[in-house]
Amino acid sequence: MEHVNEILATVGRILHETTTANTNVANKSTERLGAYIGAGITMVGGATVGLGQGYIFGKAVEAVARNPEVEKQVFKLIFIGSAISESSSIYSLLIAFILIFVSGA
Protein backbone atom coordinates (compact mmCIF):
# COMPACT_ATOMS: atom_id res chain seq x y z
CA MET A 1 0.00 0.00 0.00
CA GLU A 2 2.88 2.35 0.68
CA HIS A 3 4.18 1.89 -2.85
CA VAL A 4 0.80 2.80 -4.28
CA ASN A 5 0.75 6.03 -2.26
CA GLU A 6 4.28 6.88 -3.41
CA ILE A 7 3.36 6.21 -7.03
CA LEU A 8 0.20 8.33 -6.76
CA ALA A 9 2.15 11.14 -5.11
CA THR A 10 4.78 11.01 -7.86
CA VAL A 11 2.14 11.00 -10.60
CA GLY A 12 0.41 13.94 -8.88
CA ARG A 13 3.67 15.92 -8.77
CA ILE A 14 4.38 15.17 -12.43
CA LEU A 15 0.87 16.24 -13.47
CA HIS A 16 1.13 19.40 -11.41
CA GLU A 17 4.51 20.32 -12.92
CA THR A 18 3.24 19.59 -16.43
CA THR A 19 0.13 21.75 -16.09
CA THR A 20 2.09 24.52 -14.40
CA ALA A 21 4.73 24.48 -17.15
CA ASN A 22 2.05 24.64 -19.87
CA THR A 23 0.34 27.54 -18.11
CA ASN A 24 3.63 29.41 -17.84
CA VAL A 25 4.31 28.88 -21.55
CA ALA A 26 0.83 30.14 -22.43
CA ASN A 27 1.23 33.18 -20.18
CA LYS A 28 4.64 34.01 -21.68
CA SER A 29 3.23 33.67 -25.20
CA THR A 30 0.38 36.01 -24.33
CA GLU A 31 2.78 38.53 -22.78
CA ARG A 32 5.01 38.32 -25.85
CA LEU A 33 2.04 38.84 -28.16
CA GLY A 34 0.98 41.85 -26.11
CA ALA A 35 4.49 43.29 -26.33
CA TYR A 36 4.52 42.91 -30.12
CA ILE A 37 1.07 44.47 -30.49
CA GLY A 38 2.08 47.35 -28.23
CA ALA A 39 5.28 47.91 -30.21
CA GLY A 40 3.29 47.99 -33.44
CA ILE A 41 0.84 50.50 -32.04
CA THR A 42 3.72 52.59 -30.76
CA MET A 43 5.30 52.74 -34.21
CA VAL A 44 2.13 54.37 -35.56
CA GLY A 45 3.63 57.47 -33.95
CA GLY A 46 6.70 57.07 -36.14
CA ALA A 47 4.60 56.76 -39.28
CA THR A 48 2.56 59.86 -38.53
CA VAL A 49 5.73 61.88 -37.96
CA GLY A 50 6.93 60.87 -41.42
CA LEU A 51 3.64 61.94 -42.99
CA GLY A 52 3.72 65.26 -41.15
CA GLN A 53 7.29 66.00 -42.15
CA GLY A 54 6.52 65.27 -45.78
CA TYR A 55 3.60 67.69 -45.65
CA ILE A 56 5.71 70.39 -43.96
CA PHE A 57 8.59 70.09 -46.46
CA GLY A 58 6.11 70.19 -49.34
CA LYS A 59 4.61 73.41 -48.03
CA ALA A 60 8.10 74.86 -47.50
CA VAL A 61 8.99 74.18 -51.12
CA GLU A 62 5.73 75.85 -52.20
CA ALA A 63 6.52 78.89 -50.03
CA VAL A 64 10.00 79.22 -51.50
CA ALA A 65 8.60 78.83 -55.02
CA ARG A 66 6.23 81.74 -54.38
CA ASN A 67 8.77 83.95 -52.62
CA PRO A 68 12.41 82.96 -53.31
CA GLU A 69 13.87 85.68 -51.05
CA VAL A 70 12.77 83.89 -47.87
CA GLU A 71 14.51 80.63 -48.73
CA LYS A 72 17.15 80.80 -45.97
CA GLN A 73 14.64 81.75 -43.27
CA VAL A 74 12.11 79.10 -44.29
CA PHE A 75 14.59 76.26 -44.44
CA LYS A 76 16.22 77.27 -41.16
CA LEU A 77 12.83 77.04 -39.46
CA ILE A 78 11.97 73.84 -41.29
CA PHE A 79 15.13 72.05 -40.18
CA ILE A 80 14.62 73.11 -36.56
CA GLY A 81 10.99 72.00 -36.67
CA SER A 82 11.96 68.75 -38.35
CA ALA A 83 14.50 67.97 -35.65
CA ILE A 84 11.95 68.66 -32.93
CA SER A 85 9.25 66.54 -34.55
CA GLU A 86 11.70 63.73 -35.30
CA SER A 87 12.30 63.34 -31.58
CA SER A 88 8.78 61.94 -31.10
CA SER A 89 9.50 59.31 -33.75
CA ILE A 90 12.72 58.37 -32.00
CA TYR A 91 10.86 58.11 -28.68
CA SER A 92 8.29 55.84 -30.34
CA LEU A 93 11.07 53.60 -31.61
CA LEU A 94 12.69 53.55 -28.17
CA ILE A 95 9.42 52.54 -26.50
CA ALA A 96 8.91 49.79 -29.11
CA PHE A 97 12.40 48.42 -28.40
CA ILE A 98 11.73 48.50 -24.66
CA LEU A 99 8.45 46.63 -25.12
CA ILE A 100 10.04 43.94 -27.25
CA PHE A 101 13.46 43.41 -25.68
CA VAL A 102 13.39 44.71 -22.09
CA SER A 103 9.86 44.11 -20.82
CA GLY A 104 10.72 40.58 -19.69
CA ALA A 105 8.31 38.98 -22.13
Curated annotation (Swiss-Prot):
It comes from the Bacteria. The chain crosses the membrane at residues 37-57, 82-102. It is found in: Cell membrane. It is a multi-pass membrane protein. InterPro entries: ATP_synth_F0_csu, ATP_synth_F0_csu_DDCD_BS, ATP_synth_F0_csu_sf, ATPase_proteolipid_c-like_dom, F/V-ATP_Csub_sf. Its main location: membrane. The keyword Ion transport applies. Pfam families: ATP-synt_C. Keywords: ATP synthesis, Cell membrane, CF(0), Hydrogen ion transport, Ion transport, Lipid-binding, Membrane, Transmembrane, Transmembrane helix, Transport. GO terms for molecular function: lipid binding; proton-transporting ATP synthase activity, rotational mechanism. GO terms for cellular component: plasma membrane; proton-transporting ATP synthase complex; proton-transporting two-sector ATPase complex, proton-transporting domain. The record marks E86 as: Reversibly protonated during proton transport. F(1)F(0) ATP synthase produces ATP from ADP in the presence of a proton or sodium gradient. F-type ATPases consist of two structural domains, F(1) containing the extramembraneous catalytic core and F(0) containing the membrane proton channel, linked together by a central stalk and a peripheral stalk. During catalysis, ATP synthesis in the catalytic domain of F(1) is coupled via a rotary mechanism of the central stalk subunits to proton translocation. HAMAP family: ATP_synth_c_bact (MF_01396). F-type ATPases have 2 components, F(1) - the catalytic core - and F(0) - the membrane proton channel. F(1) has five subunits: alpha(3), beta(3), gamma(1), delta(1), epsilon(1). F(0) has three main subunits: a(1), b(2) and c(10-14). The alpha and beta chains form an alternating ring which encloses part of the gamma chain. F(1) is attached to F(0) by a central stalk formed by the gamma and epsilon chains, while a peripheral stalk is formed by the delta and b chains. Belongs to the ATPase C chain family. Dicyclohexylcarbodiimide (DCDD) binding to the active glutamate residue inhibits ATPase in vitro. This is ATP synthase subunit c. It comes from Mycoplasma pneumoniae (strain ATCC 29342 / M129 / Subtype 1) (Mycoplasmoides pneumoniae). The lineage of its organism: Bacteria, Bacillati, Mycoplasmatota, Mycoplasmoidales, Mycoplasmoidaceae.
